[in-house]
C-alpha cells in the first residue's frame, strides 16, 4: 500500500475483532445498534471548565469507568485517550477470540500495535501544567513526559499486553485512522501474524478545546439537532467527539485456520495531501485517493455498494467530497448509497474513520446505517437518511484532515456476511 495505490494485492488481511468506545456505545454491539437506528447522542458539553467556551455541543463518552477495566499501574501514567484505546483493544481481542496469552503463544514478536492520534493527552497535560504554573516544577508528575504524547496508546497497549512485534503511530491528522489500518495491513503482509490497530481521541478537556477553537471548520451552534449537518444548505461545521475503535487485523489464511469469524478484509487504500483547509483542492486529492484504493483492491467503481463519507459539514468541503465521488466513481456515483453515521456522535478526529470501519464491518447484519439529523440534502448524492437500508457488500470509507490529508479505504465482506 503506497500513497497512490499500486495494483492488486497478492495477500489479503482479515479484520477479526472490533472494540469500540464511543459516545453511543461502550461495546461494538451497542455502537452498531445505535448507528443502525440512526440515533443521535450529540448533546451540550457537560465537562467542568468548559462552561464559558464558545464550543457548546459535542459527542461525550458517558458512563466509561476506566478503573473497572484498567489496572491502577497503567491508569496513573496515562491520559483518557489512552484509557479509551486500552479498553477498546481488550474488547477487540476478546471479539477476535484471542486472549493475550494465545496471541503471543508462538512469539511475542508475532503481534504488533499501530495507532493514530491527532493531539494526545490534553486532560493529563492540563492537570500537570496547572501544577507547574500554580505550585512549581517539582510538583509535576514524571508521567507527564509520556502521557500527553500522541504515541502513548501504542506504547501502553504493547507494554500491557506483551506485544513486541512491529509497533508504530501514524500522524496524518484525521486521515490517520485509515492510514493506520493500511499500515497494519502492510505489516501483516510482511510477515507479522496479528496487528492491533486503532485510534481513540479525548479532545474535550478545556485545554484541548481551547486549542481547537482556531479551526474555522468547528461548529459553535448551541442546538445539538442542527450543530452538525453535512451536505445540507444549513451546514455550519462539525462537532468534536471522544472515543474511537480498535481492530484486530491478521493474515486471512491464519484467521481461517484458527476458526476466527472474519468481519471484513482490508482490500485497498491510498492517501494524498492537498494542504490545510484547501477544500477546493481536496476534490482532486480525494478523487485520486479513491482511484488508488480501488486500483489496489482490484475493484471497479460499480462494485462499491456504500460510501462512508468524510462529511466535514463545511459547505466547500462537502461540495468537494460530492464532486470527488463523481470524479472517481463516474456514472455509478449518483446510484451508490452514501452515509455518515458520525453526524449522530460527532467527529472523533482520528477515531472517526475507525468507527466508520466498525460500522462498515457491522454491515454483516445486512443494513446500511443512516445519517442522523440530515434531511435537506443539497448535493447530488444518494445520502442514506432517517432509516437504514438493505446492505450490500463493498464499503468505501473516506477521511480527510483539517491539515490537508486525504485517505480512502476499501473493505470486502467477510465470508459470513449476510449482505
Curated annotation (Swiss-Prot):
Domain Ketosynthase family 3 (KS3) per the UniProt entry, residue ranges: 10-413
InterPro entries xref list: Beta-ketoacyl_synthase, Ketoacyl_synth_C, Ketoacyl_synth_N, PKS_Beta-ketoAc_synthase_dom, Thiolase-like
EC number(s) given by UniProt: 2.3.1.-
Keyword Transferase: yes
Gene3D superfamilies given in the database record: 3.40.47.10
Entry-linked SUPFAM superfamilies: Thiolase-like (SSF53901)
Pfam family membership, one: ketoacyl-synt
Enzyme class: transferase
Keywords assigned: Acyltransferase, Antibiotic biosynthesis, Transferase
Protein's UniProt keywords contain Calcium: no
One GO MF term: 3-oxoacyl-[acyl-carrier-protein] synthase activity
GO BP, sorted A to Z: antibiotic biosynthetic process; fatty acid biosynthetic process
Pathway(s) annotated for this protein in UniProt: Antibiotic biosynthesis; curamycin biosynthesis
Family that this chain belongs to: Belongs to the thiolase-like superfamily. Beta-ketoacyl-ACP synthases family.
UniProt miscellaneous comment: This putative ketoacyl synthase lacks the active site cysteine.
The protein's name in its UniProt record: Putative polyketide beta-ketoacyl synthase 2
Gene for this chain: curB
Amino acid at each position: 500500500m503506497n500513497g497512490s495505490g499500486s495494483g492488486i494485492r497478492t495477500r489479503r488481511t482479515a479484520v477479526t475483532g472490533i472494540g469500540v468506545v464511543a459516545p453511543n456505545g461502550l461495546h461494538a454491539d451497542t455502537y452498531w445498534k445505535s448507528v443502525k437506528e440512526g440515533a443521535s447522542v450529540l448533546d451540550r458539553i457537560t465537562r467542568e471548565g468548559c462552561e464559558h467556551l464558545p464550543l457548546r455541543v459535542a459527542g461525550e463518552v458517558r458512563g466509561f469507568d476506566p478503573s473497572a477495566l484498567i489496572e491502577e499501574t497503567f491508569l496513573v501514567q496515562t491520559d483518557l485517550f489512552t484509557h479509551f484505546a486500552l479498553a477498546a483493544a481488550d474488547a477487540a481481542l476478546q471479539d477476535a477470540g484471542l486472549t493475550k496469552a494465545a496471541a503471543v503463544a508462538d512469539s511475542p514478536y508475532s503481534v504488533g500495535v499501530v495507532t493514530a492520534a491527532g493531539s494526545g493527552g490534553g486532560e493529563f497535560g492540563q492537570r500537570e501544567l496547572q501544577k507547574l504554573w500554580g505550585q512549581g516544577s517539582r510538583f509535576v508528575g514524571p508521567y507527564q513526559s509520556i502521557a500527553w504524547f500522541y504515541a502513548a496508546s501504542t506504547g501502553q497497549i504493547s507494554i500491557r499486553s506483551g506485544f513486541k512485534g512491529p509497533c508504530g503511530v501514524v500522524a496524518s491528522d484525521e486521515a490517520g485512522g485509515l492510514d493506520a489500518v493500511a499500515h497494519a495491513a502492510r505489516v501483516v503482509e510482511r510477515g507479522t501474524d496479528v496487528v492491533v490497530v486503532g485510534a481513540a481521541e479525548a479532545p474535550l478537556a478545556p485545554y484541548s478545546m481551547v486549542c481547537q477553537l482556531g479551526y474555522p471548520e468547528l461548529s459553535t451552534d448551541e442546538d445539538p439537532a442542527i450543530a452538525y449537518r453535512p451536505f445540507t444548505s444549513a451546514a455550519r461545521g462539525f462537532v468534536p467527539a471522544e472515543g474511537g475503535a480498535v481492530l484486530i487485523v491478521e493474515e486471512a489464511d491464519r484467521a481461517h485456520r484458527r476458526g476466527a469469524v472474519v468481519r471484513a478484509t482490508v482490500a485497498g487504500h491510498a492517501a494524498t495531501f492537498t494542504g490545510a483547509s484547501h477544500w477546493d483542492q481536496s476534490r482532486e486529492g480525494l478523487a485520486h485517493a479513491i482511484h488508488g484504493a480501488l486500483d489496489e483492491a482490484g475493484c471497479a467503481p460499480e462494485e462499491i455498494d456504500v460510501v462512508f463519507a468524510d462529511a466535514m459539514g463545511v459547505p466547500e468541503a462537502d461540495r468537494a467530497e460530492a464532486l470527488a465521488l463523481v470524479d472517481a466513481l463516474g456514472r455509478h456515483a449518483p446510484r451508490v448509497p452514501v452515509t455518515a453515521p458520525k453526524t449522530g456522535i460527532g467527529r472523533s478526529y482520528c477515531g472517526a474513520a475507525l468507527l466508520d470501519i466498525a460500522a462498515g464491518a457491522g454491515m454483516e447484519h445486512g443494513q446500511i446505517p443512516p445519517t442522523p439529523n440530515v434531511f435537506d440534502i443539497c448535493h447530488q448524492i444518494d445520502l442514506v437518511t432517517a432509516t437504514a437500508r438493505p446492505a450490500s457488500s463493498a464499503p468505501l470509507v473516506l477521511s480527510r484532515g483539517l491539515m490537508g490529508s486525504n485517505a480512502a479505504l476499501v473493505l470486502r465482506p467477510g465470508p459470513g456476511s449476510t449482505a
